[in-house]
Structures are given as C-alpha cells and as structure tokens.
Amino acid sequence: MVAKILDGKQIAKDYRQGLQDQVEALKEKGFTPKLSVILVGNDGASQSYVRSKKKAAEKIGMISEIVHLEETATEEEVLNELNRLNNDDSVSGILVQVPLPKQVSEQKILEAINPEKDVDGFHPINIGKLYIDEQTFVPCTPLGIMEILKHADIDLEGKNAVVIGRSHIVGQPVSKLLLQKNASVTILHSRSKDMASYLKDADVIVSAVGKPGLVTKDVVKEGAVIIDVGNTPDENGKLKGDVDYDAVKEIAGAITPVPGGVGPLTITMVLNNTLLAEKMRRGIDS
C-alpha cells in the first residue's frame, strides 16, 4: 500500500476559490471584509508569514493591512493600537502575530482583542464557545486539519483518533473538533507512557509537537490517516515534519506532506474566519 498524498496546496486553492466567490457576493451587498494584522518587531519569519497573509487576503478580494510596531514598543502602545482596530468599523478581523517581544504579555494582548474580530480563535471567550459547541472562531490550524479530512472524505465516526500534543493552538482544539465528528480521541503528550500502543491502534494520527521523526513506520497501523503538523527546520533550513514521511507513506492510507500539507490550510482558515467575522457582524447567514 502506498498512501494517498493529501495535497494541502491544492485543497487550499480550491477552498480559496469558494471564499473569493463569497467575498464577491458580499461586495455586491456593499461590504468588503478587512483583515488587520499587528506585527511587533522585525523577526524575519514573522514578517514573511504576515506578508503571506496579506497577499492571500488581497488575492481573494479582501482588504488587508499590516500595522507594524517597533521591537521596542511597550505593552501599552500595542494595546492602544489594538483598541483602535477594535473600534474601527471597517475592520472585520484582527490578528496579532506571535511571538511578541518579552516586554509585551502575549496573553494580555490576545485577551484584549474584540472576540467578534478574533480570527485566530485564541480569545478565552471563543475557546469557551468551542467547548460548548457554539458557533465561534476556531483556531486556524485545527480548522485546516478538519478541512483536509473532509476533502479526503475521511469518515471519522467511531474511529480511533490519536492527537500528539496538547497545545491550545493545535492539540486541544483539534481534539474537540474530532470529538464533534464522533471520533474516539486520545491525547498524547511528553508525559505519556507507552505511546506506541496508542498509535498502533489509531485510525487517525495528528502529530503537532515539532519533533522530527517522532512517528515511525513501526507504530502506524496499515491504512491509518496521518496528519503531520510538525514544521521544524533542519540544519539546512529544510522543513521537517513529526512523521518519518518516506517510510510511513508506504503503510498509511493517507498522509500530509511537509511542507505543503497543513500549512497552506492554516492561512486559508485565517481568510475563512475573516469572512465569517464580516458576515456575523452584518447579520448575514454563513
């Protein structure tokens, strides 16, 4: 068996076309979604990622802006800029690029975003809504993972799903989304014992810990679906996933590559959530 390759680039391209159609329909009603991104400092990776988000938003017809503050910006300065965007009626969605400089509290900033404009889905109110199954902004990487599974026509009901990693950004929210699809979910983490026994029984494995080569062929059940969220640069700058891709693809039923798997869907879901934010505040059904 050779796994079906779950091409995130193509899935994202198809999904963005649907978003573009919805943006055009909104414009005909007189509304244009706008994404505002706050970037603090000059970290090269953050700058590149923010530019990618801006370009992607503009490509589907949205307005996008980057609010760039100096590395030395105080927490108060960041909060003031955030408050301005919260109160700007032209802004549909706001995200703050992390990591932030040490003098700025990431949690304090994330909690200051208007929950109705929180397109990253990290505000405590939106996290709470996710866990009581209310409509909300879902963190973008988990949302992208679910779109990949949907696109691949993976039936999750009754399946054993193992999530490696318990972060609030990926591990915990994707576990909740899998539960919503009636999968039986196990979360593994750095303190888990005998991880192999859980993995060998998994129909779906989502790995999101940033440890290259963690998931090997000998712990994967034949036909399992493998979602690799790992994104770690090696000594040559080449991105590596958590999964031993070349070996595991020989036994898995389906697998995401790194790069080109989950990554393209993460930015796509930022756009999805920005569109949702605009629709919700205008009283337009999704």
From Swiss-Prot:
Family matches, as CDD domains: NAD_bind_m-THF_DH_Cyclohyd
Keywords, ordered alphabetically: Amino-acid biosynthesis, Histidine biosynthesis, Hydrolase, Methionine biosynthesis, Multifunctional enzyme, NADP, One-carbon metabolism, Oxidoreductase, Purine biosynthesis
Gene Ontology cellular component terms for the protein in this record: cytosol
InterPro entries tied to this protein: Aminoacid_DH-like_N_sf, NAD(P)-bd_dom_sf, THF_DH/CycHdrlase, THF_DH/CycHdrlase_cat_dom, THF_DH/CycHdrlase_NAD-bd_dom
EC numbers on record: 1.5.1.5, 3.5.4.9
Record Pfam families: THF_DHG_CYH, THF_DHG_CYH_C
Molecular functions per Gene Ontology: methenyltetrahydrofolate cyclohydrolase activity; methylenetetrahydrofolate dehydrogenase (NADP+) activity
Entry's Gene Ontology BP terms: L-histidine biosynthetic process; methionine biosynthetic process; purine nucleotide biosynthetic process; tetrahydrofolate interconversion
NADP recorded as keyword: yes
Pathway the protein takes part in: One-carbon metabolism; tetrahydrofolate interconversion
Binding site for NADP(+): G165, R166, S167, S190
Statement: the UniProt record of this protein carries the keyword Nucleotidyltransferase: no
The reaction(s) this protein catalyses: (6R)-5,10-methylene-5,6,7,8-tetrahydrofolate + NADP(+) = (6R)-5,10-methenyltetrahydrofolate + NADPH; (6R)-5,10-methenyltetrahydrofolate + H2O = (6R)-10-formyltetrahydrofolate + H(+)
Function: Catalyzes the oxidation of 5,10-methylenetetrahydrofolate to 5,10-methenyltetrahydrofolate and then the hydrolysis of 5,10-methenyltetrahydrofolate to 10-formyltetrahydrofolate.
Family to which this protein belongs: Belongs to the tetrahydrofolate dehydrogenase/cyclohydrolase family.
Quaternary structure, from the entry: Homodimer.
Protein name: Bifunctional protein FolD
Source species of the chain: Staphylococcus aureus (strain NCTC 8325 / PS 47)
Lineage: Bacteria, Bacillati, Bacillota, Bacilli, Bacillales
GN (gene name): folD
